[in-house]
Amino acid sequence: MNADGPVVNVHVLFFAKSRELANTPRSKVDLPTEITASDLLELLVSKFGLTPIRDNLILAHNESYIDNLSERILFKEGDELAIIPPLSGG
């Protein structure tokens, strides 16, 4: 992640176990305008204490799932990022 490049403020939404671990339903975070999905995942896991569910998280950028961790994500001011752990049920 290039810390010297431009940054934007992004809304982060937490669901289920991620909400419990982050201790909040939502937050705002400054992110670079461009970042790989893998770097983004590591940043969020570290910042919000999501290590216990790191390998099972699903990220969604503006309601579109991020399927490939090598994908480059382009953020604009006010974008939305959702952190969704797998849901269990029967």
Swiss-Prot record:
Residue positions where 1-thioglycine is found in the record: 90
SUPFAM superfamilies: MoaD/ThiS (SSF54285)
Modified residues (Glycyl adenylate): 90
Pathway: Cofactor biosynthesis; molybdopterin biosynthesis
Primary subcellular site in the record, as a coarse category: cytoplasm
Subunit structure: Heterotetramer; composed of 2 small (Mocs2A) and 2 large (Mocs2B) subunits.
Protein name: Molybdopterin synthase sulfur carrier subunit
Native organism: Drosophila yakuba
